[in-house]
Swiss-Prot record:
Coiled-coil annotated spans: none
Organism: Mus musculus (Mouse)
Signal peptide: none
One GO cellular component, as annotated: mitochondrion
Chain location of the short sequence motif Cx9C motif 2 per the record: 80-90
Protein name per its UniProtKB record: NADH dehydrogenase [ubiquinone] 1 beta subcomplex subunit 7
Upper classification of the organism: Eukaryota, Metazoa, Chordata, Craniata, Vertebrata
Length: 137
């Protein structure tokens, strides 16, 4: 998990996104039909279930179901395996989506930097395939 943080300090930090901040590029950039993620559990449902702030994510509805199952079948803690699996799987998919978003942000920052360097070279008169006068014989 810490590999992206190591890359921030050892390599170019300008193209490494900050994991604490929201992405700087629009989510539909390159994906015109991309749907926005929506929360299934409402704020009131999460308050009623007394979920902590760390538990209020896109998988909160699965966690609410799991906690209700554990409460309803208290002595038998093995009765909620299916709900536990659903919640764990949702958390895994959420983690994978966040890592893909992080990687997408990193690649878009690299692309932005490459384009800025290319524009700077063109502005100096060194376009694609051109050689500067000091190099030419």
């Amino acid at each position: 998990m810490g590999a992206h943080l190591t890359r921030r300090y050892l390599w170019d930090a300008s193209v490494e996104p900050d994991p604490e901040k929201i992405p700087s590029f629009p989510p539909d950039l390159g994906f015109p039909e991309r749907k926005e993620r929506v929360m299934v559990a409402t704020q009131q449902e999460m308050m009623d279930a007394q979920l902590t702030l760390q538990q209020r994510d896109y998988c909160a509805h699965y966690l609410i179901r799991l906690l209700k199952c554990k409460r309803d079948s208290f002595p038998n803690f093995l009765a909620c395996k299916h709900e536990q699996h659903d919640w764990d799987y949702c958390e895994h998919l959420d983690y994978v989506k966040r890592m893909k978003e992080f990687e997408r942000e990193r690649r878009l920052l690299q692309r932005k930097k490459r384009r800025a360097l290319k524009e700077a070279r063109v502005a100096q008169g060194q376009g694609e395939g051109e050689v500067g006068p000091e190099v030419a014989l």
